[in-house]
Amino acid sequence: MGSYTIPNVVERTPQGERSYDVFSRLLSERIIFLGTEIDDGVANVVIAQLLHLESSAPESEIAVYINSPGGSFTSLMAIYDTMTFVQAPISTFCVGQAASTAAVLLAGGDPGRRFVLEHARVLLGQPASGGRQGTVSDLALQAKEMVRIRSQVEEVLARHTHHDVATLRADMDRDKVFTAQEAVAYGLADEVLARRLTRV
């Protein structure tokens, strides 16, 4: 969150007033908000929230709202694997953007539960190399790992978009930006939303 102030929400109850930070208040409604670059710290928080919500009500929907430029592949896969591991149905919502690794999380929501708001964008691209340095042998090993990572991303996206890996590889060779409607047509999301769904 950087230097932003996290707002508090005041709730009046028969016992008096209670103050929560806004993210805790959203969590009490089974909403997880991912609004930053994905790194190990962010992944650990999101995973803990997913596991907590599953343990409290394993059959109830968890909504994951995404506005992220992407980030670490290993952190992404830790979140993605937890989303597929928990019993609770997972809805994903793209607000603003789901770029790079964050696009995989959007696509990884349960079928029929992947949404994109009407002015959001989704960006597909190759996993970043991170500007690695080292000996020629080290660089060769790093290049091999990058190819493995790219293949893993392609396989996950193929599973959720129903495109073949060759199509995904060609589309991800350079950054490819989708409007909300294009993201649905491509299979990264199921529906464009202008207004909130009635939650059940």
From Swiss-Prot:
CDD domains noted in UniProt: S14_ClpP_2
Catalytic residues (UniProt): S100
GO molecular function: ATP-dependent peptidase activity; ATPase binding; serine-type endopeptidase activity
GO annotations of cellular component type: cytoplasm; endopeptidase Clp complex
GO biological process, one term: protein quality control for misfolded or incompletely synthesized proteins
Domain of life: Bacteria
Record-linked Pfam families: CLP_protease
PANTHER family, per the entry: ATP-DEPENDENT CLP PROTEASE PROTEOLYTIC SUBUNIT (PTHR10381), ATP-DEPENDENT CLP PROTEASE PROTEOLYTIC SUBUNIT-LIKE-RELATED (PTHR10381:SF26)
Function: Has lost one of the conserved residue (His) proposed to be part of the active site. Therefore it could be inactive.
Protein name: Putative ATP-dependent Clp protease proteolytic subunit-like
